[in-house]
Amino acid sequence: MSIKQWPEGERPREKLLERGAAALSDAELLAILLRVGTRGMSAVDLARYLLQEFGSLGRLMSAEVGKLSAYKGMGTASFTQFAVVREIGRRILAEELQESIVLSDPDTVADYLRFHLGQEKVEVSVALLLNRQNQLIAVRELSRGTVAENTIYIREIVKLALDEYADSLIIAHNHPGGSPEPSQEDIMFTRRLAQAMSLVDVSLLDHFIVTAQTVRSFRQLGLMP
């Protein structure tokens, strides 16, 4: 049965208009994006199937175009739609973060980092640069791919903080393998970076490790120098 044949109150679009987006399931929200299903499957049926195949909404929305195109009814159009939704969400979170007092709202930082880094397939490091009021100045990508900790890399972070006139910063990186626990290398790098930042009167406030499901704070773990 196509969605047009459903009772009006159960159709995703009508349900959204009547009850709000929060009342819709993941499959119903996704069906609105997909707009149409495939032969023998409504848009909601296709959405449910894809969610089951990928395991979560986040994994589906972050799937590479080649993997997505392997499923009937999906292709570059769906990939670009998903990419746009992800980027809009990331920018909204960035705006909220920039308007907030970062240290009084750590959940906003964690939400932003999870959205920004949680689905990355390679290790990505970022710096959140803050002013004296602990407000966000900028978010800058530091590296993409595994980067060995070295003096030049630390110098680049110090230079970035000085160029942006930051009074403090938070760094974060993801663990694509899924474990949020800091490695010994992560701990040693954080100590060296904190020492380097102190020489230019910039404080390293925290270091976050991000996975798709979890965000770990070095400060909360008692690991900050």
From Swiss-Prot:
One of its GO terms (biological process) is proteolysis. Zn(2+) binds at residues 173, 175, 186. Residues 102-224 form the MPN domain. Keywords: Hydrolase, Metal-binding, Metalloprotease, Protease, Zinc. Pfam families: RadC (PF04002), UPF0758_N (PF20582). One of its GO terms (molecular function) is metal ion binding. SUPFAM superfamilies: JAB1/MPN domain, RuvA domain 2-like. InterPro entries: MPN (IPR037518), RadC_JAB (IPR025657), RuvA_2-like (IPR010994), UPF0758 (IPR001405), UPF0758_N (IPR046778). It comes from the Bacteria. Disulfide bonds: none annotated. A motif (JAMM motif) lies at residues 173-186. Belongs to the UPF0758 family. This is UPF0758 protein NMCC_1157. It comes from Neisseria meningitidis serogroup C (strain 053442).
